[in-house]
Regions:
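Transmembrane beta-strand segments of Gram-negative outer membrane beta-barrel proteins
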Residues: 25-45, 76-78, 147, 154-156, ...
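Membrane-embedded beta-strand positions of outer-membrane beta-barrel proteins
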Residues: 33-35, 76-80, 124-126, 173, ...
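Outer-membrane beta-barrel pore domains and translocons
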Residues: 36-42, 81-83, 129-131, 188-190, ...
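Outer membrane beta-barrel
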Residues: 52, 56-192, 280-298, 303-315
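Detector for outer-membrane/organellar transmembrane beta-barrel domains
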Residues: 221-314
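Outer-membrane beta-barrel "beta-signal"
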Residues: 306, 356-369
């Protein structure tokens, strides 16, 4: 029932947006709406848990309201999500990092709901937020489907991180120091309730027992090569909460993210994450990849890329895991893409059983309204 309701609202908002675009609206509205859908057809050809094929999807509805007609610099944003279909990591591949970054099971949930106020070079955001929407963002790794190219596994798997699909309440302050330097810091609920006790992510609780997650990031928006773009980020995070026996647990780590344009069409990226070996299973993470835009001259908006992600797992008989991904995104038009994708998972490490290397094939498609 909930899925049917969601799809109905999804189509209604999509139709409303299309109708508004067709109509001749002269005055700029403070409201804007958008919707998107991503679908994955995933096949595990060999290795892993078992061979097989599954389908999974992610639908999003977004609404944005700016306050400029009343006061300057205010923005309210809402994002509702629905995930459905199979779980290839859990049921087919058995990997640690997650072959699909939209895998979450069958859920309908409030993903983001926040207010942002800008003051010159400063801005403050308060509400339900995704940490990875602002921190540890890998700009040139967005082509890839494996979850680690979005958020490091050393963050996602070591602490209760407010990331897709389960976000958390938080406050974020950003300072654009200059055109080349930016600093931001945030604090989040340290232990957001899971979907079993909070099925739609609308029942929020804040208490000292849940602790907090603090993160700060400094970004240098300068290129190492003349005439090219580049971005370099360094972040530190600290997590604290009280467990069931009333003892304080502390954890943390740091990360680096580098995006560098090499030529007009070639972009390189790398990620590094480190966290204390004494309290973390995945103490080291690193990645390296490239994204080439317009490989075929007649298709300038297409993207091709190859990337490698390594999750160093030190206290397991299974050992560390490495994912190698190759993707080609065909941009059909401004709103539609199709992306064939191949991943080779060396030593899938997401189960308690030693698994054979897995070869996984994708066809991902996306639609935006």
């Amino acid at each position: 029932m909930y899925r049917t309701t969601f799809i109905g609202v999804f189509l209604l908002l999509s139709s409303s947006r299309i109708y508004a675009q067709i109509g001749e609206i002269k005055a700029e509205s403070p409201f804007s709406f958008s919707a998107s859908y991503i679908g994955d057809v995933v096949s595990n050809f060999k290795g892993g848990i078992r061979r097989g094929t599954s389908y999974l999807g992610l639908a999003n509805m977004k609404g944005d309201f700016n306050t400029n007609k009343w006061w300057k610099g205010g923005e309210v944003f809402i994002n509702i999500g629905n995930t459905h279909g199979g779980e290839p990591t859990a049921n087919l591949v058995g990997d640690f990092q997650g072959v699909s970054n939209i895998e979450a099971g069958d859920l309908t949930f409030l993903y983001e709901l926040w207010y942002k106020q800008s003051f010159g070079n400063f801005s403050a955001t308060l509400g339900l937020q995704d940490l990875n929407a602002a921190f540890a963002v890998n700009e040139d790794g967005g082509l890839f489907t494996n979850s680690s190219f979005g958020i490091h596994s050393s963050i996602a798997d070591n602490i209760p991180s407010p990331i897709f699909p389960l976000t958390a309440l938080g406050a974020n302050i950003q300072w654009n120091i200059s055109d080349s330097f930016e600093w931001q810091t945030a604090i989040f609920d340290g232990t957001p309730d899971d979907f079993e006790s909070n099925p739609y992510n609308t029942n929020w609780k804040l208490s000292k027992d849940q602790g907090f997650l603090a993160v700060t990031e400094f970004q240098i928006k300068k290129s190492l090569l003349p005439g090219k773009t580049g971005s370099y980020k360094f972040g530190i995070y600290y997590h604290q909460h009280n467990d069931t026996i009333e003892t304080v647990r502390k954890n943390g780590g740091f990360y680096l993210v580098a995006d560098q344009q090499i030529t007009k069409k070639l972009f390189l990226f790398s990620q590094i994450g480190l966290s204390p070996k004494s309290v973390n299973k995945n103490d080291v993470y690193c990645s390296l990849g490239f994204n080439y835009k317009g490989l075929i001259s007649s298709r300038p908006d297409d993207q091709f890329g190859v990337a490698v992600a390594h999750a160093g797992i030190h206290n397991s008989v299974i050992g560390s895991e490495t994912a190698i991904e190759t993707a080609y995104q065909l941009q059909i038009n401004r709103n539609i893409f199709i992306k064939p994708d191949i991943q080779y998972i060396i030593n899938p490490a997401g189960t308690d059983t030693k698994l054979a290397n897995a070869l996984v094939g994708f066809v991902r498609f996306g639609v935006q309204f």
